[in-house]
From Swiss-Prot:
GO biological process: one example: light absorption
Signal sequence region: none
Protein's organism: Nostoc sp. (strain PCC 7120 / SAG 25.82 / UTEX 2576)
Protein name: Orange carotenoid-binding domain-containing protein
Domain OCP N-terminal per the UniProt entry, residue ranges: 21-171
Main localization, broad class: membrane
Taxonomic lineage: Bacteria, Bacillati, Cyanobacteriota, Cyanophyceae, Nostocales
């Protein structure tokens, strides 16, 4: 599993020189400029490092039972297939799993990624390699995310995971 990206560096320095009120939009913009693997790494680190505070907000408002079948389906896959599913979701590739994910509510998508990170920690889903070191750009996005207040963090995470997958009902 290879995670690399330095492509968003210049956008980062420009994006985070903006006022605090624009911090949410800037963080989202730079996150979306990361490579797919770096996006997945940032989500994993965000959920594992900040998961204790994210969990109540995500699962409290979500109907996670709607995503349980999808999570169980992913658990049954090989690690290579699991990684491909996550990449397909982030890249908005039109697959059966991406379409199933696409019909979930934004809060359920937020909870889905939290549960996926928990499954990674428990070894049911392909983990981030133990020797993995997040890219400079990914690290900057993660630090920017940590610098936001709780409500802003949830807004950023909800927006980035809401944009993943494919909405089968969209025109």
């Amino acid at each position: 599993m290879t995670f690399t990206s330095d492509s968003a560096s210049t956008r980062f320095s420009q994006a985070f020189g903006i006022q605090t009120g624009d911090a949410v939009a800037s963080t989202i913009t730079v996150f979306q400029a990361l490579s797919i693997d770096d996006q997945l790494a940032v989500l994993w680190y965000a959920y594992t490092e900040m998961g204790r505070s994210i969990t109540p907000a995500a699962t409290g408002a979500a109907r996670l039972q709607l995503a349980e079948g999808l999570l169980n389906q992913i658990k049954q896959m090989s690690h290579a297939e699991q990684l491909q599913v996550m990449r397909d979701l982030a890249a908005k590739n039109n697959t059966q799993v991406s379409r199933s994910y696409g019909i979930l509510s934004n809060n359920t998508k937020l909870a889905f990624w939290y549960e996926l990170s928990e499954l990674m920690v428990k070894g049911f889903v392909v983990p981030v390699p133990t020797d993995y070191k997040i890219s400079r750009d990914g690290s900057q996005v993660l630090e920017a995310l940590k610098g936001l207040d709780f409500g802003q963090q949830i807004t950023v995470l909800r927006k980035v995971v809401a944009d993943m997958g494919v909405d089968p009902l969209a025109d």
